[in-house]
From Swiss-Prot:
This is Exoribonuclease 2. The keyword Cytoplasm applies. Residues 561-643 form the S1 motif domain. It is an enzyme of class 3 (hydrolase). It comes from Klebsiella pneumoniae subsp. pneumoniae (strain ATCC 700721 / MGH 78578). Belongs to the RNR ribonuclease family. RNase II subfamily. It comes from the Bacteria. The keyword Ligase does not apply. Involved in mRNA degradation. Hydrolyzes single-stranded polyribonucleotides processively in the 3' to 5' direction. One of its GO terms (biological process) is mRNA catabolic process. HAMAP family: RNase_II. Residues 189-516 form the RNB domain.
Length: 644
């Protein structure tokens, strides 16, 4: 009698439409309950039984129940699952398989089976790639996954690398393929093999892609010739090797080893500018005025060179600083180093005055043993030799940006527009509270941005700089010429690393078309999208491997009195994050470690400060001493506490 009753259907419909609902993201906790976060202000409690239907990170719609002043959420439908493809550790019990996702807030094992075509016999502790197949909110009885790829065994010393590369779906080895002979590009190459070109790199570098040669003129100017390795002399556009490089977009540099964009015989041999070997190059010659200005007579041309010395950063820096026992092999090489130092000083002064110079941060290098164990982590400060190469490359990239813009009107450009226009009013208000006055429209211009950056760089600490970072936009890769606010330049297009950046290979082909006087099509936007995505994934992979290695390195310091100097890099409601100065590891200090009485403690992300009883005790950029309280290997997180 009730089956087809229209009134009943209408009543059901009414009840359904009147029931309050909310859409948001599930946040799991370690206690079994969770929260539905609707926005920054509003969240609803999800009781433990209801959490069984969802997973941390799922975007869902939930019914909101109100009982005795308390609201709770009952998951109703799935908008977007958190897990689709993931990595994890296999559990095996009575021949039944399950997988625990490798994620700090996902602790539950998900029943699974090997997908069709996966031959591996999975054992307890194996690492695998899995894909979700069932979800309770899709009408399934429970969660279920399929194992689509075996990564490695639990006792493999190189787990951090293989698991991270699998997680981000990145290649594990160099691409296949060989380039047997140079292409006939119809380019006339100048013979510069007699000139004293030198390369300056880390001692262990094999893929040398830049060589430098400087000379002085009678009227006090400097001529700099930058010669860059020429992989596009071997790799035809649209060839198998080219397409593989296009997908990879970059060489992936991970702690301990790299996965090259090109086959190793190209990156480390045929294209590498090895000492005393004749190599084809794409070259740029520029004239530097006394104040470091790059004059208008920029020239790009194809050439052959023979590097006369493979120099190492530390040797060159020591020699220029009058330390150590290393000496250049000849007077000619010594003269080159001295001239290149002059080039560096002129360009550095020009950039200080007319553009922007990044503050020097050390690079951290992991020293690894045979089995991937971390023997040491070394902070490598940026010294004079690093700056010689950096200034030469930036100058060469400015030249390419100008020539591509003026001759073609397009290229592969690194573009950074400074601040997001939507944020400049807030930015000006924040700066005003610190007695720095800016015009919200003026900071959107290159000149206004540079003026503000110089003012911030002159501040006694980096505190204010850290506060405004969230208002900045991200750098992008674009085929359209545009300014790079971060560098303080009108245009910037890189072409100096074609062995390890596909965008630089594209710019090589464009520059060669200009040299030959040919027309050439604008690069496809898909290429720049792929580059941006790969850059993001490679950075995440590098960070993930580093986190794992930091946890291994500091594990034996947990619970000891060993003190580390640490810079506060972020404050959140739950505590603060710090970076250890000596090795670059990031650690978290939970709020209870800062002060025992929660009501007397205010951790403000907005202000970047921690107040105790109304007094600012810690702020971002402060350097404090910490000890390591705990290292959680399964989540690769390091917990620290202020040293007393």
């Amino acid at each position: 009698m009730f089956q087809d009753n229209p009134l009943l259907a209408q009543l059901k419909q009414q009840l359904h439409s009147q029931t309050p609902r909310a859409e948001g993201v599930v946040k799991g906790t370690e206690k079994g309950f969770g929260f539905l976060e609707v926005d920054a202000q509003k969240s609803y409690f999800i009781p433990p039984p209801q959490m069984k239907k969802v997973m941390h990170g799922d975007r869902i719609v939930a019914v909101i129940h109100s009982e005795k002043e308390r609201e709770s959420a009952e998951p109703e439908s799935l908008v977007e699952p958190f897990l689709t493809r993931f990595v994890g550790k296999v559990q095996k019990k009575d021949d039944r398989l399950a997988i625990v996702p490798d994620h700090p807030l996902l602790k539950d094992a998900i029943p699974c089976r090997a997908a069709r075509g996966v031959e591996h016999d999975f054992k307890q502790g194996d690492w695998a790639v899995a894909e979700m197949r069932r979800h309770p909110l899709k009408g399934d009885r429970g969660f279920y996954a399929e194992l689509t790829q075996f990564i490695t065994f639990s006792d493999d010393h190189f787990v951090p690398w293989w698991v991270t590369l699998a997680r981000h779906n990145l290649e594990k080895e160099a691409p296949d393929g060989v380039a047997t002979e140079m292409l006939d590009e119809g380019l006339t190459r100048r013979d510069l093999t007699a000139l004293d070109f030198v390369t300056i790199d880390s001692a262990s570098t094999e893929d040398m892609d830049d060589a430098l040669y400087a000379e002085s003129t009678a009227d006090g100017k400097l001529l700099l010739t930058v010669a860059i390795a020429d992989p596009t002399a071997w790799i035809a556009e649209g060839s198998k090797l080219d397409n593989a490089a296009k997908v990879r977009a970059f060489t992936n540099y991970l702690p301990g080893f790299n996965i090259p964009m090109l086959p190793r015989e190209l990156s480390d041999d045929l294209c590498s500018l090895r000492a005393n070997e004749v190599r084809p190059v794409l070259a740029c010659r520029m004239t530097l005025a006394a104040d470091g200005t790059i004059e208008d007579n920029i020239e790009f041309f194809a050439a052959t060179i023979e590097s006369k010395a493979k120099l190492a950063y530390d040797d060159v820096s020591d020699w220029l600083e009058g330390r150590g026992s290393w000496q250049p092999d000849s007077e000619a090489i010594a003269q080159q180093i001295t001239l290149l130092k002059d080039v560096c000083q002129r360009r550095s002064e020009w950039r200080q005055t007319h553009a922007l110079v990044f503050k020097d941060r050390p690079d951290y290098r992991f020293v690894l043993g045979e089995k991937g164990e971390v023997l040491d982590i070394v902070a490598e400060p940026r010294r004079i030799a690093n700056r010689i190469v950096e200034e030469s490359m930036i100058a060469a990239n400015i030249c390419a940006a100008r020539v591509l813009r003026d001759k073609l009107g397009f290229g592969v450009y690194n573009v950074h527009t400074g601040f997001d226009p939507a944020n400049t009013e807030q930015l000006a208000a924040l700066l005003k509270t610190h007695d720095v006055h800016v015009d919200p429209t003026e900071v959107l211009t290159l000149e206004g941005f540079c003026k503000l950056r110089r003012e911030l760089d002159a501040q006694p600490t980096g505190f204010l700089d850290s506060r405004i970072r969230r208002f900045q936009s991200f750098a992008e890769i674009s085929t359209e010429p545009g300014p790079h606010f971060g560098l303080g330049l009108e245009a910037y297009a890189t072409w100096t690393s074609p062995i390890r950046k596909y965008g630089d290979m594209i710019n090589h082909r464009l520059l060669k078309a200009i040299i030959k006087g040919e027309t050439i099509a604008r690069p496809q936007d898909e290429a720049t999208v792929q580059m941006a995505e790969r850059r993001r994934l490679n950075r995440m992979a590098e960070r993930d491997v580093a986190d794992w290695l930091y946890a291994r390195f500091l594990n034996d310091k947990a619970g000891t009195d060993t003190r580390f100097a640490a810079e506060i890099i972020d404050v959140s409601r739950g505590g603060m994050r710090v970076r250890l100065v000596d090795n670059g590891a990031v650690a978290f200090i939970p709020a209870p470690f800062l002060h025992a009485v929660r009501d007397e403690l205010v951790c403000s992300q907005e202000n970047g400060t921690v107040q105790i009883k109304g007094e600012v005790v810690y702020k971002v950029t402060d350097v404090i001493d910490v000890t390591i309280a705990e290292v959680r290997m399964e989540t690769r997180s390091i917990i620290a506490r202020p040293a007393v």
